Amino acid sequence: MMLLEEPGALMASPEPVAADPTRRERVVVAVVAVAVVGIYVAIAAAHGALGASRNDDWAYIRIVKDLADTGEFRLDGWVAAMFLGQALVSLPVMALFGQGILPLQMMVAVFAAVGLWATYAVVRPWLDRRWTALSVACLAAGPVYGIVAVSYMTDVPSYALQMITLLVGIRAMRSAPVHLGWLAGALGFGIASFSMREFGVASGAVVAVYAVAQAWAGRQRLRPVLALVGAWSVGVMALYFWRSNLPNTWPMVVDVSPGGLGSAANSIWRSALTIGLLASPVAFAVSPVRLLRAMGQRLTRRAQVVLLLLAITALATIPFHGLGLIGNHADRELAYWGTLPGDPPSLLPTPVWVLVLLVALYSTAVSVGLVALRVEAVLRRRRSWRSGLASTADRGAHLVVSFVVLYAALLVATVVITPTELFDRYLLVLVPLSAALLARAGRAEQVMRSLPGRREWAALLALATLGVAAIDASAAFDGAKWRLGEVVEARTGWDPGSIDAGYEWYGYHQTAPVERQGFLTAPNFWRLLFAPRPVCATGSFAPSDQSAVPADDVIATVVERSLFGVEVRLVATPGPDDCP
């Protein structure tokens, strides 16, 4: 119970300037959140990506359309996420606006704005207004959120509901005894988040455990709290086992082989670097000299040896030659570049990419140092968990610390035990909350300034520049792929399902069920998701030497340029099958 014992110490602030957001502040944040998401939507619309299938959109849309038409929730063998909750929320949207892609993407955009607003509301009661804004901006300005916010992926809706779960849960815990109505609401939102993505269970679990601990410590309303938590637990388990036993469920495989563990370690390291990069505007506020001095003075010899061994192990085992981020969105190339064969254009030149990695390394190292200092502070105090719960009003920070630890532990356990591949979109919830906790911890250790200054806002501007470049280039790529398929269809009259204009186009236009044909190997792995059928045209990145593809062999060429000059040039050629 040590985690529950001292999260207050972990978050203690020498300058208690945090407060609940005022009504005006809430309205301003809501307006800003809507404006930010509006920019994401405008960028996608400018390149034709709004209303086009993006990444796994096609697979989710096939399921929800089938649900709307038949009333049955049937999996296709490709979707691994829980998805049920998002499908149910989508039904009224489809009833009002039709079964097109655009209404569903706009629904997710609404979730994106709500998620930013809720995150601010979660952090603000225990952090200064400026640090809160900077922490949320680390996610909003980065290269990940703006891409998945204009899609039909489950990541953003699950993120938004997890933030709402924490927000309502904090409201329940701040009253003494625990407010049963708010607790029931928080657990309900927790189940809703879990019903979209399995990792969403973390928010409800943290609220449930903390509610029981608080009721036990105060010896008030323990039985009704246990009843609510028990009902939540039964609901989560019933939903999980029901979903796991549906036909065409993605198989769960256990892999603890040396190769699997090595891959897991690489994924964990890359994920840490990705979070470090996105939280770097806060990390730059930390004085490295003060941090090193504090670590030398306050850490025990044992802790210093552990950190030294950790650094040596990292240097000895991490393949720095291939060092990078976890990928999928924040990458040197275009987001989802593997969804079309050929050589994609680079988003960032080599010197800029090296600088990005150095920033990520620095920020991650600073974060590790701060975590070590705060853990040491927790261990020094050694107060009982009962007194810790009873003596502090900083329960929002308690929940957030516990949530971040649990969510990260779930990610680590999943990637260690199973061959699940991590992507940066799985880290959404960790970015703003980790940044906020770093700000709080840095001020508690007196190794950073009390308020963000020019350096931190300049770092945020640099992150936003990287974010806009990635979001814009991704929209250009997705829009170009979709337009390539449309042009080929218009010029040839071929069935759209016989045109391979990339992963999204091909999957969306198939009418046959998913029938995986062995190992999915690139390029064009998406064809192996379905039974063999004639493919009349194939899209790809245009080769740098345009003479490599004779003009007579080109059915269509689509060129899209991003705001920062990245040129996406795609070509479609006949075949591999002959079609009339």
Predicted regions and their residues:
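Membrane-interface transmembrane helices that cradle and orient dolichyl/undecaprenyl
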Residues: 11, 15, 67, 124-130, ...
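Signature aromatic-anchored transmembrane alpha helix within multi-pass, membrane-resident enzymes
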Residues: 33, 188, 230-233, 301-314, ...
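Membrane-lumen/periplasm interface segments of specific transmembrane helices
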Residues: 43, 194, 206-341
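Membrane-proximal lumenal/periplasmic loop motifs of glycosylation machinery
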Residues: 45-55, 68-103, 196, 507
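Transmembrane-helix motifs of polytopic, lipid-linked glycan transferases
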Residues: 106-127, 164-168
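Membrane-interface alpha helices of multi-pass inner-membrane proteins
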Residues: 135-137, 163, 168, 181-197, ...
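Short acidic/glycine- and proline-prone juxtamembrane loop motifs at membrane-interface regions
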Residues: 150-158, 199, 423
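Membrane-embedded, lumen/periplasm-facing catalytic core of multi-pass transferases
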Residues: 169, 334-348, 421, 456-541
